[in-house]
Design a protein with these regions (language model features):
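Active-site core of glycosidic bond-cleaving carbohydrate-active enzymes
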Residues: 321-352, 402, 428, 482, ...
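Inter-helical turn/loop segments and adjacent helix faces that build the functional surface
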Residues: 141, 234, 274-275, 334, ...
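Acidic/histidine-rich catalytic neighborhood
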Residues: 436, 440-493, 497
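Non-catalytic C-terminal accessory modules of carbohydrate-active enzymes
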Residues: 56-109, 115, 394, 575, ...
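Helix-terminus loop motifs that line ligand-binding clefts
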Residues: 297-312, 338-411, 417, 424-428, ...
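C-terminal capping/lid segments that line or modulate ligand- or cofactor-binding pockets
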Residues: 14-38, 43-45, 327, 373-375, ...
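Carbohydrate-binding/catalytic loop surfaces
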Residues: 307-319, 362-394, 451-471, 516-530, ...
Length: 727
C-alpha cells in the first residue's frame, strides 16, 4: 500500500510532510519537499533528544539539523515545483518497503524537459543511518546540473535555536560531518554525510555544504547519493567520531533500500492486519497506522518513549502523555511484547520524578507527570498562549488535576503482566509501580460522611475541569488500588488501608435512567445542540462561541470519557448499560480529540451496532488521511493510530482480555468479508482468520491454550475451525 500525492499543492505541504515521514524508532525524518517552499516545516527528530530553551517552561523534542535539502539548478535555473512548468508529478511513500519517492517531469525556461527523481529511506538494520538519492535526466537536450546539499544546523523549533555548533569537518572529497550540542540538556549530536561523488565544500554559521556540478547529456542521468549517519550521546560516547566512522564504510543507497525492503517484508508478513472488503481505504488506513506505530517507537531502548506526534513533528513539543500506555502500548504488547515492556520501563526509570510531583502537591506515592520528556519531571506549562484580546493567559489545568494518568499506568502494568506472565518484571518493577500509584490514590481521596470521594479532577474529557467524582478516574483509581491488594504490593498496614479504600470509595452507578454520571454535576448541566460542532470534529470550534468556563458548565464532552471507562473495564458493565450510556454520551461528545471516535466505535461493536461502529471507525481513519489540508501539519496523531488498531482487534474482531483469559466474539461490518491478524498471548503466536461464516484460530506452539469463542471455552492445540453463529 502507498500514501500518494498526485499533485503538488502548497496548502497540503506540511500535512504530507507528516504523513510521509520515514524512520526506524531511533529517528524520524519528515517527508518535506527537498526544496525550500514558503511555510514548509522541515524536521528530523531523534527519540529522547529534548532540550529546554532559555526561559522556557518545558523541554522540547529538538528539531535536529536538516539533511534532506537539495538545492538544484538546471542551466542556472533553480528547480522549483512552484516556479517551473510541471508536466508530471507524483510522490509516494511505499509502506511496504519504507521508501519515499518523488517523480517530477518539468520544463525549464529554455524549454528543456527534464526528469527529477528524489528518494529517501531509513535504514532498518543500522538505526543510525538513512539514505538519500537524486537522479536528474534531461530528455530533450543536454543540461548543466548543479546540486548543493549538506548538514544545516540552523534548523529551529518554531524559531527557537536549540543547538550550538561544536565542530564542522570534511574528510577527503566525499564526506562532511558536523557536531552540535543542545543548549541546556547538553546532549551531543554527531552527523556525517557520505557521497558517491567528489564535492566542493563550504562551512559557515552551523552549516556545512557540498556542491556538485556536471554537464549531463540528453537521455543520460546524473545520480547523487547521500548516506546520512546520526549519533547522539544518549546512546553512544563521542557520537561525532561514531558517525564519521560509520559513514566511511561506504554503503550504497541500493544496499540500504534492499535491507529496508527485507525488514518491511518480514514486518508485514508477521504483523499486518489484512482486511478484505468493499474499500481498499480500510487496508491503507491500517497499514498507515502500523507503519507509523513501528517507526515512531524505540525498539530496544527503555530510556525513551513515544510522544504525541511520534517522530513526525513538533506538536505538543514531543511530550509523552497517557496516550502511550492506553492507546499505543497495546499494539506492541500483542505484537512485540519486549517493546511494550520498554515503554513501562521508561516510566519506572522516572519514578522519582513522579514521587516528587506527588510531594509537591502534598500527596503520597507517585503522581506521574501529565506531560513527560527526558527527566521525569512535569513538563506541562502552567499557562497557555497569550490571549491577544485580553492580554491574559489561560491556566493549563492538566498537570494540576488530570491525575488519572497514574491509574492508567497501573492499568498498563496489569495488561502487560497478564498478557506475558512476566513474573520477573512484576516482582522487580511492576509491584513498585502499582504500590506507588496506589499510595497516591490513598492520599488523594477525601472522606465525605462514611465514604471516600475524589475531588477536583479532570477526566479524559478536557472540556470538563475541576469536577468531583469523575467516573473514569474513580473506577480506574479503584482498579489501581485493587491491583495492590491482588499482588500484595505493600506491607500489611498498607494493604489494610488499600482494602478500606476499596470498601469506601464512591463508584458512580447507573441512575434510574440507567445513565452513569460522568461526574457529580454533568447530568444536571444544560444541554445544547452540538450538531454544528460535531460536523467539524477536531477543530475545537465550540470555543469560538463559548469561553472554556462556559463549556465547563454544559453537557459537552471533548472526547470519550465515560465511554472510555466502558472500553477499559468491559467486565464491569452489562450490555444494556453500555448501550444506554454510549448513545447518551455520543450525543454530548464533539470528538475534538483524535482519540475519541475509535473508542466509541469499539463500544458500538460491543452492542452489535455494526454499521454505526464502521461509520465511526472510518471517520477515525480520516483524522490523518482525510481531506483537511492542515489536520496533521505539526505531526501525525500517534495515539489515534494506535486506537485504529484497537478498534479492529477489540471492536470488530471482538477480542477481550479479562482476568488472564482470552476471548473472541467477532462482529464484522457488512463492508468486510474477511479479516486476519496475528496476536501474541502468553508467549503463543496466534493467527486469527475471521469471515462471516467461519472463525479460524491457528498457533505454532505445542502447549494447549484455553480460549473462549462466543462464550464457549475451547482448548486450542494447533488449529481451531468454527462455524459462525449469526453475523
Amino acid at each position: 500500500m502507498k500514501v500518494e500525492e498526485k499533485q503538488f499543492d502548497l496548502e497540503y505541504i506540511n500535512k504530507y510532510a507528516s504523513q510521509m515521514t520515514i524512520g526506524n524508532g531511533f529517528f524520524g525524518i519528515r517527508g518535506s519537499q527537498e526544496e525550500d517552499y514558503r511555510n514548509q516545516v522541515r524536521g528530523m527528530f531523534a527519540a529522547g533528544v529534548y532540550n529546554r530553551p532559555l526561559g522556557a517552561e518545558s523541554a522540547e523534542l529538538v528539531n535536529l539539523p536538516d539533511v534532506i535539502r537539495w538545492e538544484i539548478k538546471i542551466d542556472g535555473e533553480h528547480f522549483s515545483l512552484e516556479t517551473m512548468k510541471v508536466l508530471a508529478y507524483e510522490r509516494t511513500l511505499d509502506l511496504e518497503m519504507g521508501e519515499l519517492k518523488r517523480y517530477a517531469l518539468i520544463e525549464t525556461a529554455q524549454g528543456k524537459k527534464v526528469e527529477v527523481i528524489t528518494c529517501r529511506v531509513a535504514d532498518q538494520n543500522n538505526l543510525h543511518q538513512a539514505a538519500l538519492k537524486v537522479v536528474i535526466k534531461p530528455l530533450t537536450e543536454d543540461c548543466q546540473v548543479d546540486v548543493k546539499t549538506g548538514i544545516d544546523g540552523q534548523q529551529t523549533n518554531f524559531g527557537t535555536q536549540q543547538l550550538v555548533e561544536k565542530e564542522l569537518r570534511v574528510f577527503g572529497d566525499d564526506l562532511i560531518s558536523a557536531s552540535y550540542q543542545t543548549t541546556e540538556s547538553k546532549i551531543d549530536i554527531g552527523i556525517a554525510a557520505k557521497f558517491n561523488k567528489a564535492g566542493v565544500f563550504q562551512a559557515k554559521n552551523r552549516r556545512i555544504t557540498a556542491s556538485f556540478s556536471e554537464k549531463i547529456r540528453k537521455n543520460t542521468s546524473f545520480t547523487l547519493e547521500k548516506i546520512i549517519v546520526l549519533s547522539t550521546s544518549l546512546q553512544q560516547t563521542d557520537p561525532f567520531k561514531k558517525s564519521i566512522a560509520q559513514a566511511q564504510k561506504s554503503v550504497s543507497y541500493t544496499e540500504i533500500l534492499e535491507q529496508s525492503m527485507s525488514y518491511w517484508t518480514d514486518f508485514w508478513h508477521q504483523h499486518r492486519i489484512t482486511i478484505q472488503g468493499d474499500s481498499s481505504f480500510d487496508q491503507l488506513a491500517m497499514d498507515f497506522a502500523a507503519y507509523h506505530l513501528q517507526i515512531m517507537t524505540p525498539r530496544n531502548d527503555p530510556s525513551v518513549s513515544v510522544g504525541a506526534k511520534g517522530l513526525t513533528g513538533e506538536g505538543y513539543k514531543g511530550h509523552v502523555f497517557w496516550d502511550t500506555e492506553i492507546f499505543i502500548l497495546p499494539f506492541f504488547l500483542y505484537q512485540f511484547p519486549e517493546v511494550a515492556k520498554n515503554l513501562l520501563l521508561y516510566r519506572y526509570d522516572r519514578l522519582e520524578g513522579a514521587r516528587q510531583k506527588a510531594r509537591d502537591y502534598h500527596y503520597q506515592g507517585a503522581l506521574f507527570p501529565w506531560e513527560s520528556a527526558h527527566t521525569g519531571q512535569e513538563e506541562t506549562p502552567k499557562f497557555a498562549a497569550l490571549n491577544i484580546k485580553t492580554g491574559t493567559r489561560q491556566e493549563v489545568a492538566s498537570a494540576a488535576a488530570e491525575h488519572h494518568i497514574s491509574a492508567d499506568l497501573a492499568y498498563a502494568v496489569q495488561e502487560y503482566v497478564q498478557a506475558t506472565e512476566d513474573q520477573s518484571f512484576l516482582e522487580t518493577k511492576g509491584k513498585t509501580l502499582i504500590h506507588e500509584t496506589a499510595a497516591f490514590w490513598l492520599s488523594r481521596a477525601v472522606k465525605v460522611d462514611d465514604h471516600l470521594e475524589i475531588h477536583r479532577v479532570i477526566g479524559p474529557d478536557e472540556y470538563t475541569e475541576y469536577i468531583d467524582n469523575n467516573a473514569y478516574t474513580n473506577y480506574l483509581a479503584h482498579y489501581n488500588v485493587a491491583l495492590a491488594v491482588k499482588y500484595q504490593a505493600g506491607d500489611p498496614l498498607f494493604l489494610k488501608e488499600c482494602q478500606n479504600f476499596l470498601d469506601k470509595l464512591y463508584l458512580p452507578v447507573p441512575n434510574k435512567e440507567q445513565l452513569i454520571p460522568q461526574d457529580d454535576t454533568y447530568l444536571s448541566k444544560p444541554v445544547i445542540d452540538l450538531t454544528t460542532y460535531k460536523e467539524r470534529p477536531g477543530s475545537q470550534s465550540i470555543l469560538l462561541d463559548y469561553a472554556r468556563s462556559e463549556v465547563n458548565e454544559l453537557q459537552v464532552s471533548k472526547q470519550a470519557d465515560l465511554v472510555m471507562l466502558l472500553y477499559l473495564l468491559p467486565e464491569y458493565f452489562s450490555q444494556p448499560i453500555v448501550s444506554k450510556n454510549l448513545h447518551y454520551y455520543e450525543n454530548k461528545t464533539i470528538h475534538d480529540s483524535s482519540l475519541s471516535k475509535a473508542i466509541h466505535a469499539i463500544e458500538a461493536c460491543r452492542i452489535q451496532e455494526m454499521e454505526w461502529a464502521y461509520h465511526l471507525f472510518q471517520e477515525a481513519c480520516l483524522i490523518d488521511l482525510g481531506p483537511d489540508p492542515h489536520s496533521s501539519d505539526d505531526g501525525i496523531h500517534a495515539a489515534s493510530l494506535g486506537a485504529l488498531w484497537l478498534a479492529v482487534i477489540f471492536g470488530f474482531s471482538g477480542i477481550t482480555v479479562t482476568n488472564g483469559t482470552l476471548s473472541i466474539s467477532p462482529r464484522l461490518p457488512s463492508a468486510w468479508e474477511k479479516i486476519s491478524f496475528p496476536f501474541i498471548w502468553k508467549n503463543h503466536r496466534l493467527l486469527f482468520v475471521l469471515t462471516k461464516k467461519q472463525i479460524v484460530i491457528k498457533k505454532e506452539t505445542k502447549e494447549t491454550l484455553p480460549i473462549f469463542v462466543n462464550g464457549d471455552q475451547y482448548q486450542l492445540e494447533k488449529e481451531l475451525i468454527l462455524e459462525r453463529r449469526g453475523k
